[in-house]
Amino acid sequence: MGVARLRELLPDYAKDLRLNLGSVTSQSQLNNQQLWGTVLTSAIASRGATTLTELEAEALEHLSPEAAKAARTAAALMAMNNVYYRTLHLLEDKEYSRMRAGLRMNAIANPGVDKVDFELWSLAASAVNGCGMCLTAHEHELRGRGVSREVIQDAIRVASVVHAVAVTIESHEQVPATA
């Protein structure tokens, strides 16, 4: 189940991912809640059914119901915010950036867990979703709260590995490689 099962499902050509998945979930500067919340948020953001099923089951062994809800909330809000703010960043007409967003995001103010944890999870989802504007905002908030670059890097590493695992497993399940 979980990490072990995903490592078994990864094809031989993804041996590095197999090793990285083991490393990022066992050797981290993130505390247990930060780590498994980052794993869950990243799995949701990565949109891989098998990866989400496996990692969610394991994450729920490590997270309180409140933390699991907050991780899901971070993934949901970032799915919206990352599209919106990435689009504003990419549009040539910067007037859009000065307009009121008009999007509800009350959970960011009161996520039900430590604000640092929620910010780390939002950062991870933003990394998966590729929103530079959001990444900068979350990194700035975390650094302002005294979080080290090493901790931030660990959250980004978890997100990148979980995303790569999801992409690889889902594509391999759809079209098994011959080599």
Swiss-Prot record:
Disulfide bonds join C131-C134. The active site is at C131 (proton donor), C134 (cysteine sulfenic acid (-soh) intermediate). GO terms for biological process: cell redox homeostasis; response to oxidative stress. Coiled coil: none annotated. Gene3D superfamilies: AhpD-like. It is an enzyme of class 1 (oxidoreductase). One of its GO terms (molecular function) is hydroperoxide reductase activity. InterPro entries: AhpD (IPR004674), AhpD-like (IPR029032), AhpD_core (IPR004675), CMD-like (IPR003779). Its EC number is 1.11.1.28. Keywords: Antioxidant, Disulfide bond, Oxidoreductase, Peroxidase, Redox-active center. It catalyses: N(6)-[(R)-dihydrolipoyl]-L-lysyl-[lipoyl-carrier protein] + a hydroperoxide = N(6)-[(R)-lipoyl]-L-lysyl-[lipoyl-carrier protein] + an alcohol + H2O. Pfam families: CMD. Antioxidant protein with alkyl hydroperoxidase activity. Required for the reduction of the AhpC active site cysteine residues and for the regeneration of the AhpC enzyme activity. Belongs to the AhpD family. Homotrimer. This is Alkyl hydroperoxide reductase AhpD. The gene is ahpD.
